[in-house]
Amino acid sequence: MDLEGKCCLIHAIGGIIFGYLANYVYTAGLGIFSGIATLIFLFIGAVIFGHISAKTFGEESLTQKQWLGCGVLPFFLVAIVVWVLKFNGLI
């Protein structure tokens, strides 16, 4: 598997974890700020997993454009899907 595939896999796993936890942030009782707090929570998760992949593969291994394509995009897509499934009680 190439470097971008490994980065995508790491971020997809992070998306599953943070998407599951995002439901608890959303239902924490923050009123109208719950959606904003959840998106900030997911953004922090993407940054955390970005640092994990940078330390794992080397800081110069991926450009910022590659990280946005193979890291951030899969993270948010997987996290939103898992969040919606958890919110609706399917998982």
From Swiss-Prot:
Keywords: Cell membrane, Membrane, Transmembrane, Transmembrane helix
Keyword Membrane included in the entry's annotation: yes
Pfam families associated with the record: EMC6_arch (PF19094)
Cellular location(s): Cell membrane
Keyword Membrane annotated: yes
TM region(s), chain numbering: 9-29, 30-50, 67-87
Disulfide-bond pairs as recorded: none
GO cellular component terms attached to this protein's record: plasma membrane
Membrane topology of the entry: Multi-pass membrane protein
Protein name: Uncharacterized protein MJ0606
Protein's organism: Methanocaldococcus jannaschii (strain ATCC 43067 / DSM 2661 / JAL-1 / JCM 10045 / NBRC 100440) (Methanococcus jannaschii)
